[in-house]
Amino acid sequence: MHPDSQLETAVKSGFDPKSLYSTELTKVNEPARTILEKYSKIPADNILQHVKDLRDRAFAFPYACIGQASFLELSIASSPCYPEMLDRVKKGDRLLDLGCAFGQELRQLIYDGAPSQNLYGSDLRPEFLELGLDLFMDRPTIKSRFIDADVLDDKSALVTQLTGELNIVYISLFLHVFDFDTQIKVAKRALELLAPKAGSLIVCRVVACRDQAIGNATNARLPYYYHDLASWNRLWERVQEETGLKLKVDNWEQDDALAKKHPLEGIYMLGSSIRRE
């Protein structure tokens, strides 16, 4: 289901999009603040207003990650896979942030020394990619390629131009918006985008729950699917069965500010690496 259709369905069920807008944006946390100051060259005293102005423009699309400014909570560097990802990109590997929103995690990589030409970002909404360029004020300098695409569209530029061309796919806070069977399709697509060789890597940051009955109560309103550890492993078992590929899956619980603020009980952030063998 397209996000616009999801929102329309939710509104008809009594959901108020304005409930996602936080009026308590009073500071910009690290590391986003340093990146905006040092990479984007925004004067320190102007950073908060710059972020507020962009957040208000972006809230034309009333998603929680925008209304609550959680796009500022950068997390890629907290993954235990980050040193490997950064090192590989510095050495020439190509990384895609799938469902990248404003491309904020890609700017973390660039700030830490990754060549921007080795980085790709893809999102369903081209407006988000443009807003990212405005947020980080790097339109004249960034060499990364941003592709607006539906990951499940076989004819999209993402699929026709990058299949088999990538080395790492990073997926953060994206899979849960699909039901279980569609998540399998997305996982298989991510594998198709990777070079067909050992070492090709998917790194995920996934909203997970200790009690699936609570976590998936939103199904009455939206077709989200929150994993527990067992269902997450089952997903990748299915992917291996259907593709014939052998994958090494490693999981960990990741300390995460967004999980701590989540309104549902028992929500945590599941980190995972899926490596082709």
UniProtKB/Swiss-Prot annotation:
Which EC number(s) does the record attach to this protein? 2.1.3.-
Cite the annotated pathway.
Secondary metabolite biosynthesis; terpenoid biosynthesis
What residues form the membrane-spanning segments? none
Keywords from UniProt, A to Z, are:
Methyltransferase, S-adenosyl-L-methionine, Transferase
- Residue positions annotated to bind S-adenosyl-L-methionine are D123, L124, D150, V151, L152
Q: Which residues form a coiled coil?
A: none
| SUPFAM superfamilies listed in its UniProt record | S-adenosyl-L-methionine-dependent methyltransferases (SSF53335)
Q: One GO BP annotation here?
A: methylation
Key word S-adenosyl-L-methionine present in the record? yes
Under Gene Ontology molecular function, one entry of this record is: methyltransferase activity
> Which family is this protein grouped under?
Belongs to the class I-like SAM-binding methyltransferase superfamily.
Q: Relate the protein's function as given in its record.
A: Methyltransferase; part of the gene cluster that mediates the biosynthesis of andrastins, meroterpenoid compounds that exhibit inhibitory activity against ras farnesyltransferase, suggesting that they could be promising leads for antitumor agents. The first step of the pathway is the synthesis of 3,5-dimethylorsellinic acid (DMOA) by the polyketide synthase adrD via condensation of one acetyl-CoA starter unit with 3 malonyl-CoA units and 2 methylations. DMAO is then converted to farnesyl-DMAO by the prenyltransferase adrG.
What PANTHER family has UniProt attached to this entry? METHYLTRANSFERASE AUSD (PTHR35897:SF1)
Instruction: Note the subunit structure.
Output: Homodimer.
Protein name stated in the entry = Methyltransferase adrK
Q: Which gene encodes it?
A: adrK
